[in-house]
Amino acid sequence: MSNFKKTTVDMSASRTELHDLLDLTGSEVSINNLPAGAKVPFVHIHKKNEEVYGVLAGKGFMNIDGEDIALNAGDWLRVDPSAKRQLRAAEDSAITVLCIQAQAGSLADYSLTDGVIV
């Protein structure tokens, strides 16, 4: 059995979830593409997971608890589990975001304390 797993995804797909493709056990990662003017069709919260959004391309907005946060390529945004959120693309631009979910408060170590040089 290998100690890694690689996959290739269609970067133009509307949504790709990597948990099954990579056998993830500690986080959920998805790639999300919205065309210009489109939005996620629901507002949501999480029971336990915080989310980190990285804007890979384009621009748009994240509505968090009623406040619109402008997003542009290169921006990163962390959202608490209980915050109501909805992503939408700008009227004149598509948006591609990487979303990482992990249980809030579960990070026990960081790169410098968890990594071991071998």
What residue ranges belong to the model's regions?
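Histidine-centered metal-chelating micro-motifs
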Residues: K39-V40, F61, L77, P81-L87
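Ligand-binding loop in jelly-roll beta-barrel domains
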Residues: P81-L107
